[in-house]
Amino acid sequence: MILSSKYKLVILNLIGGLVIFFALILLRLPVLINSDQNLTADEALMANHIMDLLNGGPFYFYYDFARYFGITNGLAAIPFFLILGVGSLAFKLPAVCFYALYILSTYWLVKKIHPQAALTVVLLMIFSSPAILSLTTMNYGVGLICFLGNLIFLSFFNVKETGGTKAFYCFLLGFFIGFGIYTFTYAIVYIGSILILFVLSNNSWNTFRSKISIKVIASGYMAQKGGVQKFVSILDGIILFFILTVLFSYVFGGFGIDIAGFSIMQSNELHKPVGQLLVLVIIRICLFRQDVMDKLNSTKRLIRSTAPLIRRSILFGFLGFAIGIAPRTASIFTGETIRGGQGFDVDFVPTNLVNHFWQLMTHYIPDVLGLWAPILRLFDYRMNLFYFLNLFLIAIIVLLIGRAIVLFITTRWKDVKDIFRLKALSFNPAQFLLVLPILICAAVIVSQGPPATRYLFPLHGVVSILVAIYLQKIRHKSKIFFTFALVAWCMFSSIETYQGYVKSGMVRNFSIIKLPDHYSKILEFCNQHKILHAYSDYDTSAIGTFLSKGNVQIAEYTKTVWAYKSKERLAGKDDFAIIVRNESALKNYQKYLDGNLHSYSKNIVKVGNGINEVYYVFSSFKGEKGAIDRLRSLIVG
């Protein structure tokens, strides 16, 4: 039987994806073998949510701790739970799978931009920096949203290539946008990128741009007759702003604008602004209703003037978006989500902007590219053979990345200027490599919170694409240098990865070491003493609950909690213990117990060889019920 070209393509992509996945597994083997020891509290919190769901618990669309992050990454762990059993390894494997899909989808992207560089970019992304390797063993959904981001780009390119006449591509674009927003609102950088490219490459942009200048708006305002109409025109602007704010809050989860710590605007409540908007609309209609029908008729004429195929495609796009974002919509209608939250808080104080820019350029971007740690080692190591090898490889990698970026920007300098000036663009798929990094860096700089490596994750893919394109141009001139550059890249990544494993203790003399698991000892103690419910710090509560497979339910002993559903469940349990490892918390509990309870038991559980590697377990409390209940939330935090 002869397979058609489409089936062959599907099979080749499937095989390629599996090869990438297993190559990534091999490079991450020390971390995966020590998955219990490398499980983070955030991962454990998400894993507990999925474990409760599998055990028959209620279904929620979001985790306890946030409304900007759906449970897609956790649901992806269910097949691994069913095959491998509930555990850290099964929860971490989806992160590797997502990164494999991200690499495969990047291959598809490069096939549209520079087909000869597609395989090269796969190799470059497999041999990543230690920072990227670490992130792709943590099931935070970062690789997943980057994969969905690539699908958004690919769908957008197909829509542009077909002139928006293919309803299926518009449906896919809408679906991936909606589902990306639900999965992780970080998708906004991808949505913003295609929005900029769509607007600037639209044939009507120059005409529209000429009508939105300050001069045109001011003259239109002055042309209004009478004070009432002028006031109504201002009110129209306020109503438009309210509409956009409400839509943004419902879709993305709200935003906040601060200057020097002072809140200028917060968009947190979901339903309250809708009522305010209706009041404004009613006031507007009462003041001046004569032009309302004109505006409605203008809207109808605009819709009717659109070609039927385009109109059909737009409807399919909205349908796809509605289906993709349906989990978030359902969470709002069921009452699970009642606040937009502060998902996009920005602070425009100059010192904040300068500080974030400096951190970005001197630490976080070098860390994403794998240059931060080796450059630091140049100041620590003595001048031996490894020192000069390290210096040589750093020079090669910096040269490759620098030359690739400079070459790409200089050949598209007109596009760069037009993007910053908001001038019309002649569309080219490669332009996303200009817009996406600009949006990511700008978002990190203006963010109220400090920069983080995970928010720069897509830059790794962008740089890999640019280097792959540059190497393909070099290959036509010198295949020897092309091969040498690839070997240097892979060697640099491998050495840095090995150094990281050695430093963490997971590898010694090229052998993988199984690290001791501190949590197993405290869980063993709980099982021996029949402790089924306890309160502890964030890490111990989340990780301990998951590693015990829910047999020991541990909630946070702080007044402010992340896993509030877990704490609500334990509130009705009278028999509980307090597990403490923090010195400050130990003093607080010891003082409170001695001063407010009649009696209690205290046990010390040694979990390591270090002097501070101990847990203190308080249980068997005797005293007034109110005094005992206050133990559940004694720590401020």
Regions from the PLM with identified roles:
Residues 17-20, 97, 106-128, 146-147:
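Transmembrane-helix signature of polytopic, membrane-embedded enzymes
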Residues 31-41, 54-89:
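Membrane-proximal lumenal/periplasmic loop motifs of glycosylation machinery
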Residues 2-6, 155, 162, 190-234, ...:
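Perimembrane helix-loop-helix junctions
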Residues 29-33, 88-92, 99-102, 123-146, ...:
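Aromatic- and kink-enriched transmembrane "portal" helix at the membrane-lumen/periplasm boundary
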Residues 215, 220, 333-408:
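Membrane-lumen/periplasm interface segments of multi-pass, membrane-embedded glycan/lipid transferases
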Residues 53, 112, 149-173, 180, ...:
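Membrane-interface transmembrane helices that cradle and orient dolichyl/undecaprenyl
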Residues 18, 196, 318, 391-396, ...:
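Signature aromatic-anchored transmembrane alpha helix within multi-pass, membrane-resident enzymes
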